[in-house]
């Protein structure tokens, strides 16, 4: 039999098996990202008439959302963007998750660069007829991802130390200015959010805004396989405003995503 990873089957080591599994998983993720383009009927507008730039797979996502008064959040959003409301208020979300299979179009996922942990803090905006996401901050455990996203998408990425094991996720910004701790698990079965519901408003978003509201990047994914979640969350210095009341929790096990290059807005 042929050797694998430079060893014969008899001497196949656990480390070699892990490396082989990682390689296989990266290509499985890449195939799933491409397949996401086969399902488009749920989109609020057509796919861009140009090639996407980047693929990602997101894993073990918690969506934690707080009601925030519109007037409290409005000063933290560029004037060129409309701060959206649903069920009588604006909403601020925090989402911890794992990025896997990160790759540029036509390029295989690169070891050590394709997987990392991330926490984003966001709200929901629109310009014209395009509802999307505005990020207050994005904390990532990969310095390379932080630098690339800052440069290309002009997003407020920050480098953080992130420890994630099973149901636990802990993030500490490298500069010491902010921390986040969560324990969470899914409850019930996964299903897409129904149109015209709060859940649909919070998760079914197909573009992001960057720069000072001067850039927009389209994204695409299948409808979110959303579940209810039970969680405890403690954050310090991540949200730009004081958070009050109990958050809403939702969970998704996985999502395959493609992202287009940003375009300048008029």
Language-model segments: residues:
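Short amphipathic alpha-helical segments with coiled-coil-like heptad repeat character
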Residues: 3, 80-85, 131-132
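Hydrophobic, proline/glycine-rich low-complexity stretches
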Residues: 25-103, 248-266
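Active-site-adjacent core segments of small-molecule enzymes
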Residues: 32, 43-44, 108-111, 115, ...
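A glycine-rich, hydrophobic loop/mini-helix early in the fold
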Residues: 86-92, 99-138
